[in-house]
Amino acid sequence: MINKKYIYLGTIFLFLVIIKLINPPIIKKISFVNHDFYQKMFNRGEVKSVTIVDIDEKSLAKIGQFPWRRDIYSKILDNLNQHNPSVIAFDIVFSEEDKQNPKDLLLQLQKESDEFLDVKVTNTNQVFIDSLKRSKVVLPVIGEPNDNFIENNSEPKLRLIVKGDDPKNFIYRYKNKITSLENLNSAAKGIGSISLLPNIDGIIRNVPILYNIDNKIWPSLALEAVRVATGQKNLLVQSDKNGIQLIKTRKNIIPSDQNGVINIKYKKFDKKNYISAVDIVNNDFDQKRIENKIILIGSSAQALFDIVKISNGKTVPGVEIHAHIIDNILKNENIVKNLITQITENIIFLILIIFLIFIPTKIKPKFSIIFFIGSILLTNILSIVAYQFNFYLDALFPSIAATVMFMTSLYFRYLEENSIAIENEKKQSILKKEREIAGEVQKKLFPSNKKIEKYIFAKNTPAKDVSGDYYDYYQVNENE
């Protein structure tokens, strides 16, 4: 029974270890539940270094349908620049010429009629380019996994210093790119990727900080915005055969995993950090919300379909994701989940379930239950404490696995003790039967007792003279 018990326990142990290492979707979802719970419970702090210029419903209603003419963006840039922003980053790709450009419309009319030959109009593309040159602007790039037939030779503005293996071997790769027009990118101070990686349940929990797009290394929009805002030119990337080990600017260390992915620590983002784009156009806003802030220009309008769900349970505009990443980078506060935390998590997992295989079988049942509860509590407390220091260790799956092992171990202990109890009961039954048989044998060894009737009976008669003496006697029966 003992050998069979350990065979079953060993099989379950191996099964749990294998699925932990393989990490199939169901295990990922279990870990996501734990991760999201922490994000909701320990959602401390506030993003204060970023302001979002919001292309909202109000702006669409007053300015008109989207996309807008480029001179509107030019006006937004010029009005923002009056109040000394650290950097302005667009969450909008300008991949085509301005279709509402009066210059282009005039050229079309001039082809059809000579009446418009002497008319002069503004070239909104050029107006926008001029504003870009006067500003500290970061434009976006998007990774495209399929063939892209639009040739664009724009290259990263970031200067990369690589130590160790080539980072392109480890970071997320896209075959091609979608980005703004080359003349716009040339006028910008930086270019960063806005590609997001939703998890299997569609929630944004982590994003790459570096991308391999078109066989070139591009930073994320958030990282590029921080670089331009702080006046840095270089980014150090250190890697080895296991992947990315270090991403560092002059002022910030960015703890990513081996694939250059960071886990976002979401904080409170006050609605006051949003300014309607139309208010910027009309120059009707509080300048303190712009001064020395990193400005993101994006959209919260439902019609533009840039709404995502994040791990603290909220649904937010996609541009707000970049705001949280920027805050994490500036404060070195993103959640660390890398090779070291994974190894630590696996060691805790193994120790926990091994203990719960052997120890409960060696102590009394009531103490084994106390040990089990204590082990689960200790694992979760360790996970929570680690999270306070921005390290993520999943406690939910180890707790579930430990419960399975403990219940299985307890079940086999019950079977074993029940088997022993049944065996003892059989022995007691045999002993009882043997005692009964021995008693019967012993009875047969003693002589049989004569049945005595009316034992307490006497008859007193007068004394008789026998040879000169007098005697009394008692008659018990007729013969005695």
Language-model segments: residues:
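… and, occasionally, acidic/histidine-rich disordered N-termini of signaling adaptors
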Residues: 423-480
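Loop-to-transmembrane alpha-helix initiation sites
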Residues: 389-403
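Aromatic-anchored segments of alpha-helical transmembrane domains
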Residues: 16-20, 375-385
